[in-house]
Regions:
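Terminal low-complexity, poorly structured segments
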Residues: 5-10, 15, 145, 151-153, ...
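N-terminal compositionally biased, intrinsically disordered segments and leader/signal-like regions
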Residues: 7, 17, 73-75, 137, ...
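Intrinsically disordered, low-complexity segments enriched in small/polar residues
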Residues: 15, 31, 87-88, 97, ...
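N-terminal segment immediately downstream of the Sec signal-peptide cleavage site
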Residues: 26-83, 154-191
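Predominantly extracellular/secreted and cell-surface proteins with exposed
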Residues: 59-131
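Acidic, glycine-rich flexible loop segments
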Residues: 112-159
Length: 191
């Protein structure tokens, strides 16, 4: 009997030790919500005059204001892993003169790393936008869900993002020195 207890204790210690040194996987969980990104004043007219347009990749969408002063990208949130919030679909930025485009597929908005990552045409991830500031963050809890809202995200192109867009679209209209857009994010998940 004593051998069995010792063997069981040894087995538990080995298993616990193996778990302690095993890499920790980030738990991804389903989520719902919306991410919107509206171009800052002057951005869409500057892009349009340079022959640059935006379009949505389903289920994402891009809508333009009545007088084409701004464009709003709307993407559904489908999952989260800690501070990274994954969306579905994406958007495409196109040079209308040459037809070349850069896709931002399944953008991930990370509220701790303060970046928006995209899967590009080449299959690589790139931090296309940086989140310079988040004006407000609110959380609401019900017995079954927890909802968090981030409002007034100041979005700017990263250096790598601006260089990628300028090179791929054969333009120089993309810059890191100006606010590109304002973002809002709502994420709901089960408790």
């Amino acid at each position: 009997m004593r051998r069995r207890v010792t063997a069981a204790l040894l087995l538990v210690c080995l298993a616990t030790g193996a778990l302690a040194i095993a890499p920790v996987a980030v738990a991804e969980e389903p989520a719902s919500g919306t991410f919107t990104m509206t171009t800052a004043p002057g951005i869409l007219p500057a892009w349009t005059s340079a022959g640059i347009s935006m379009s949505g990749i389903y289920p994402g969408s891009v809508t333009t204001s009545r007088f084409a002063n701004n464009a709003t990208v709307t993407l559904p949130v489908v999952a989260r892993a800690k501070t990274a919030n994954a969306t579905a679909g994406g958007f495409r930025i196109t040079n209308t003169d040459t037809g070349t485009s850069v896709r931002c597929l399944i953008p991930v908005i990370d509220t701790k790393a303060l970046v928006i990552d995209c899967l590009t045409n080449d299959g690589f991830n790139i931090a296309l936008f940086s989140i310079e500031e988040i004006q407000t963050r609110q959380s609401f809890t019900t017995p079954t869900t927890r909802t968090t809202l981030w409002r007034g995200m100041d979005l700017r192109l990263t250096t790598a993002g601006a260089q990628t867009l300028n090179r791929a679209l054969e333009t120089n209209v993309f810059s890191t020195s100006v606010r590109t857009a304002e973002g809002n994010l709502s994420v709901a998940r089960d408790r």
